Swiss-Prot record:
<dbReference type="GO" id="GO:0061711">
    <property type="term" value="F:N(6)-L-threonylcarbamoyladenine synthase activity"/>
</dbReference>
<keyword id="KW-0012">Acyltransferase</keyword>
<dbReference type="GO" id="GO:0005737">
    <property type="term" value="C:cytoplasm"/>
</dbReference>
<keyword id="KW-0963">Cytoplasm</keyword>
<comment type="function">
    <text>Required for the formation of a threonylcarbamoyl group on adenosine at position 37 (t(6)A37) in tRNAs that read codons beginning with adenine. Is involved in the transfer of the threonylcarbamoyl moiety of threonylcarbamoyl-AMP (TC-AMP) to the N6 group of A37, together with TsaE and TsaB. TsaD likely plays a direct catalytic role in this reaction.</text>
</comment>
<keyword id="KW-0479">Metal-binding</keyword>
<dbReference type="GO" id="GO:0005506">
    <property type="term" value="F:iron ion binding"/>
</dbReference>
<feature type="binding site">
    <location>
        <position position="115"/>
    </location>
    <ligand>
        <name>Fe cation</name>
    </ligand>
</feature>
<feature type="binding site">
    <location>
        <position position="276"/>
    </location>
    <ligand>
        <name>substrate</name>
    </ligand>
</feature>
<feature type="binding site">
    <location>
        <begin position="134"/>
        <end position="138"/>
    </location>
    <ligand>
        <name>substrate</name>
    </ligand>
</feature>
<feature type="binding site">
    <location>
        <position position="167"/>
    </location>
    <ligand>
        <name>substrate</name>
    </ligand>
</feature>
<comment type="similarity">
    <text>Belongs to the KAE1 / TsaD family.</text>
</comment>
<dbReference type="InterPro" id="IPR022450">
    <property type="entry name" value="TsaD"/>
</dbReference>
<protein>
    <recommendedName>
        <fullName>tRNA N6-adenosine threonylcarbamoyltransferase</fullName>
        <ecNumber>2.3.1.234</ecNumber>
    </recommendedName>
</protein>
<dbReference type="InterPro" id="IPR017861">
    <property type="entry name" value="KAE1/TsaD"/>
</dbReference>
<dbReference type="GO" id="GO:0002949">
    <property type="term" value="P:tRNA threonylcarbamoyladenosine modification"/>
</dbReference>
<keyword id="KW-0408">Iron</keyword>
């Protein structure tokens, strides 16, 4: 089955072609980072308008790269949520219109299920069951995965997601958008031990997260440094390192607890923050000590992309899942509501 995947949940337009027998044939992505940088964050209306502008040219590009024509496509998968409603509607309406014109089915895909299954596109994919850490700008969740659509939520953030905390902390220190990569870049030049931040909710049992207090601690530390006359690049680097260490250690501690609770030794990390090198190193060491395995997607598939949507959609379409031509998207959509395959 040849599936065209469309991703428009936020600020990246992703298109890909996935074949159930030949694998990923082509993918293309346009990031709106430069468009939103001047505003310090994503502007929903601008995001939607840019998706409209980019979608069809990217589809043509992917078809050309794969050497395919529309008549060869068996189905279209598109992100139906969660995400920005306006942005989601661009992808959904495009997918349904093309599906109607080409006489093929279209299927809405859960954005975070796409992220969760992205490591399946690698040469050594994880086997079910496993524990997944979904960590991005909008989500921080620990999920027990027994199969596609068989998800048990083990823990999640009570406030800010980890990626959101990265971005907000970076913005408070006057760093460029997006803040996560900026924090990671500065942390590489930071001096360890100059600052120490709390590991939120690690002093109590359970698998819930909270990053708003950590963000406030970083803000207070930065303001105190500025008040003392030190707003140097090195001060930013040292705070960035301490902040990143706190987030990484918190995520690592919770992942270890989740694995023990589930009785598993396989961990999948997915979402934009999973590209963070310090997080990967920490989790690899933890799984190594447990004699377990950790899996993640290649860096370009950690952030939003069409390939993960095409793959996730293909799995459900092959299982016989279909939907009507009605255009329906959801800004919020718990993964536990998905039907199992």
């Amino acid at each position: 089955m040849l599936v065209l995947g469309l991703e428009t949940s936020c600020d990246e337009t992703g298109v890909a072609l996935y074949d159930s027998e030949r694998g990923l044939l082509a993918d293309a992505l346009f990031s709106q980072i430069d468009l939103h940088r001047a505003y310090g964050g994503v502007v929903p209306e601008l995001a939607s308008r840019d998706h409209v502008k980019r979608m069809l040219p990217l589809i043509r590009q992917v078809l050309d790269e794969a050497g395919c024509v529309p008549t060869e496509i068996d189905a279209i998968a598109y992100t139906a949520g969660p995400g920005l409603v306006g942005a989601l509607l661009v992808g959904a309406s495009c997918a349904q219109a093309l599906a109607f014109a080409w006489g093929i089915p279209a299927l809405g895909v859960h954005h975070m299920e796409g992220h969760l299954l992205a490591p399946m596109l690698e040469k050594t994919p994880p086997q079910f069951p496993f524990v997944a850490l979904l960590v991005s700008g909008g989500h921080t969740q620990l999920v027990q995965v027994d199969g596609i659509g068989q998800y048990t939520l083990l823990g999640e953030s009570l406030d800010d997601a980890a990626g959101e905390a990265f971005d907000k902390t970076a913005k408070m220190m006057g760093l460029n958008y997006p803040g996560g990569p900026e924090i990671a870049r500065l942390a590489e030049k930071g001096v360890a031990g100059r600052y120490t931040f709390p590991r939120p909710m690690c002093d109590r049992p359970g698998l819930m997260f909270s990053f708003s207090g950590l963000k406030t601690s970083a803000l207070n530390t930065w303001q105190q440094s500025v008040s003392a006359g030190d707003d140097s690049e090195q001060a930013r680097c040292d705070i960035a390192l301490a902040f990143q260490q706190a987030v990484v250690e918190t995520l690592t501690i919770k992942c270890k607890r989740a694995l023990k609770q589930a009785g598993m030794k396989r961990l999948v990390i997915a979402g934009g923050v999973s590209a963070n090198k310090a997080l990967r190193t920490s989790l690899e060491k933890m799984l190594g000590d447990m004699k377990g395995d950790v899996f993640y997607a290649r860096p370009e598939f950690c952030t939003d992309n069409g390939a993960m949507i095409a793959y996730a959609g293909c799995q459900r379409l092959q299982a016989g899942q279909h939907e009507s031509l009605a255009i329906s998207v959801q800004a919020r959509w718990p993964m536990e509501q998905l039907s199992p395959l």
